[in-house]
Regions:
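Carbohydrate-active catalytic/glycan-binding domains of CAZyme proteins
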Residues: 1-218
Length: 218
């Protein structure tokens, strides 16, 4: 198998899941904007995401694209006031006549006093058609909450569930009958002194419990 590095102008912070739209690939990052690629290897700037904010994620549902992002700047040892918002678009191509994001809607919040920060959105459409959002950072819990796949709104009465702790940048994945939760543990953004590492657990239910390969609950 041939291994190749990405080329072009691939700088991006907190990139989202890569999504295909009309033969091109898109990823979004913290601060707004993102990257576009025609082959998945060579990237250039040009993706457009309004709202700025942090750590977005994106998913295709039917013939539309749902983007989630956080209106907060990052974790804090004392908690962080913030919110996760979702918005739709018919296309991710900023040159298309159909390109227009809907008004963002708040689907999760943190008040600065609880053990969770509303940041680092992760989206998953399960095999049963249910839509899930994970969020949170290393100073508290990772939480999961169910969204309506037709609106992107939080389902009324659905309360977030704590599924992990002391990690961030969570990504929920479904594969072969199992729900997987990938997240990062340690510290980032310190060059060679960074201690970031990826942790993973799996569960038969999207709401957990997620356990690792030796049975430890995340």
């Amino acid at each position: 198998m041939e291994l190749r590095a990405q080329v072009g102008a691939p700088y991006i912070h907190d990139p989202s899941t890569i999504v295909e739209c009309d033969g091109k690939y898109y990823t979004f990052g913290t601060g707004g904007g993102g990257l576009i690629s025609e082959d998945g290897w060579t990237w250039k700037s040009g993706a457009v995401r309004p709202g700025r904010g942090a750590a977005p994620d994106a998913i295709k549902i039917g013939d539309r694209y749902l983007v989630a992002y956080s209106s907060t700047g990052g974790g804090s040892a004392n908690g962080h006031v913030g919110s996760v918002l979702t918005m739709w678009n018919k296309t991710l191509d900023p040159d298309s006549a159909d390109f227009a994001f809907t008004e963002p809607v708040v689907v999760a919040t943190s008040n600065g006093h609880e053990d969770c920060d509303a940041i680092d959105a992760g989206l998953l459409m399960g095999p049963d058609g249910r839509l899930w959002l994970t969020y949170g950072t290393y100073y508290g819990y990772i939480r999961i909450v169910e969204l309506d796949p037709s609106t992107g709104f939080r389902i009324e009465g659905n309360e977030p569930v704590d599924i992990a702790i002391s990690c961030e940048a969570s990504v929920p994945i479904y594969r072969d009958g199992w729900y997987y939760l990938l997240a990062t543990h340690g510290t980032c953004c310190s060059g060679a002194n960074s201690t970031y590492n990826i942790v993973v657990g799996r569960s038969k239910s999207p709401t957990g419990p997620y356990v690792d390969n030796v049975g430890r609950d995340m």
